[in-house]
Amino acid sequence: MLAVLIAHAAIALLAPLLFTRFGRSAFYVIAAVPAASFIWVLLQGGAAHSGQWQQVIPWLPTMDLAIALRTDSLAWVMSLIVLGIGALVLAYCARYFSEDSPDTGSFGAQLVAFAGAMYGLVVADDLLLLFIFWEITTVLSFLLIGYARVRLSARRASMQALIITTAGGLTMLVGVILLGQSAGTYRISELVAMGPQLASHGPIIDVAIALLLVGAVTKSALIPFHFWLPEAMAAPTPVSAYLHAASMVKAGVYLVARLAPGYSDTAAWQPMLLTLGVGTMVFGGWVAMRQYDLKLLLAYGTVSQLGFMILVLSVGTPDAALAGMALLVGHALFKATLFLTVGIIDHETGTRDIRKLSEVGRQMPVLLVVAIIAAASMAGVPPFGGFVAKEAVLGTLLHDVQADTGDALAWIRLLGVILGSVFTVVYSARFVWGAFGVKRSAFAQLPTGEDGRPMRTPAHHAARSFVAPAVVLTVLTIVYGFVPGPVEHSLLPWVGEFAGEATLHLALWHGINGALLISLGIIALGLLMHANRRTLAAVLHSLPHMTPAERIYREVIDSLDKLAVWVTGKTQRGSLSFYLSVILITAIVVPVTVLFLYETPPLGSMRIADSWGQLVAAALIIGACLAVLRAGKRFLAVLLVSVTGYGLALTFALQGAPDLALTQTL
């Protein structure tokens, strides 16, 4: 595990030199590192499933910080996603960028470094180490989103992502410290095992978990922090395909999955994650249905799906855990595929606006098939991986409702998932139609031909190596649908950490049951809504576009900017005497104030002076200082300042420190 981290760090340092030598083909070279790491991790599956694959290297013993790495079944699955999709995206970059694209060396270095940091995050077995990798991914995402730094939108989006995720990370750090100090350990494996026993520590554990969850929901773009993710679509498409579909935004989901076996019964867990999960799934799907930009459509769809995953994993049962992770695997495959598809369309046609795209499918038939399969998987259409995962979720939630425990939360989860899934079908159909369909003149913003119909969008031929990564992910989506058993088998050791026994099995066909009927109803209703897209569009666009959270964020940022201007105007006056006065007043007032706040000495015990000589020296210093303020000439002021120095030397001498007095005099 440590070797994988070192390899990614090393290739990131060498990347600029490789790009200087090989040009954009260097993406293939650096892609070899996550690809080789993927193969190596894949071969270690047996050790991961047994829970014996771990490394512990002392780092800062005084801070109880060690490089503790551990790959269990959950981390193993996440590692394969991070490394495998990372390698494919890097290979995709070799055709996405041209030879004259600027800063490809630094971009490649940052992207492969991000893959290494994300791998470190999922294998970290120390909360403090996990936080370090967490923040590394934040910084690298800031750099990657702001790749096109000459554009204001890219700079603004990168700064917004940095502010939101950093604020969540700092909140999470407080939770990390509270939990670690309360438990007496920062080892994640030990903390999860101790979860039920830590409940006796009182509300401190509930507060710690709530703070950790704040970090998770900001990283995974749940409401009200969702708006940074759509704004981050200013990044190059490979960044969106990797960070915002398969890795970074999954960090919060992973943290919830990691903590769920031990802390799903804490006070803040269910209310917080249920509310945010359902709200995010429904809201994200609702907004996705009215997007014209293909990347924004996928971005809001990702927000919706992240809420879906958090909602399912928060249930805290073995079946829900398995279904939630099955959903995560399926989402990583189809969403990365769709982002790569958008990148190809944008690259070959020059636009992502569905109003300017028409008949692209006839010119790119392979890409059309890829997009249909991936979108169908996203919508939960059989026989693809997304259907297997979604039916598993519906079956689990339906079972909870039918258990007749009187739990209203079970009904809220099920109804929220059904509504959000209908929206998912709608925006999935909108994606395929918008990217590849034939547009009518009433909708399209295209030049018209002699017959009055919009002309088709001209598209260049996409190289096979450009389309290949999307094809590979599509094949995996199909295989996952027909053969989900390996994913289930891989996750069972982690699922066994939950209380209770897992009864769910991932399969393409469970017979005709309630979950299947609900799935078919969702698909039918979603397609019906898409067929009436004009009416739907009229309803959607009648609503405000900016959410209250985004408005509040912008108002806060604007207020901070105004405050900074005001403070600067008050303090930066160009006057040296003013600056010195502020420094001296602060240096005197603050320590004295703190002294009297914490320990006020009795007035009777205070001594003004030990001798008359000290009073004379003090009077000399004070008098010289006052005279400096009244001095009209600089030379006289310098002489008076020297008098204060001699007065201080006299004080040292009277206190029995002739060496200090001599030093001060000289």
Show where each model-derived region lies.
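Transmembrane helix-loop-helix hairpins at membrane boundaries of multipass inner-membrane proteins
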Residues: 2-3, 13-109, 178-201, 206, ...
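N-terminal signal-anchor/start-transfer transmembrane helix
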Residues: 4-21, 217, 221, 281
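Hydrophobic alpha-helical membrane-insertion segments
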Residues: 30-45, 168-177, 371-382, 469-486, ...
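Membrane-helix interface motif
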Residues: 46-53, 178-188, 381-398, 482-500, ...
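Hydrophobic alpha-helical transmembrane segments
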Residues: 68-83, 202-217, 408-421, 506-526
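Hydrophobic transmembrane alpha-helices and their helix-loop junctions in integral membrane proteins
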Residues: 88-105, 109-130, 139-449, 458, ...
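Cytoplasmic/organellar membrane-interface segments at the starts of transmembrane helices
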Residues: 361-369, 424-526, 535-559, 563-567, ...
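Juxtamembrane/interface segments at transmembrane-helix termini
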Residues: 433-435, 528-545, 599-602, 630-636, ...
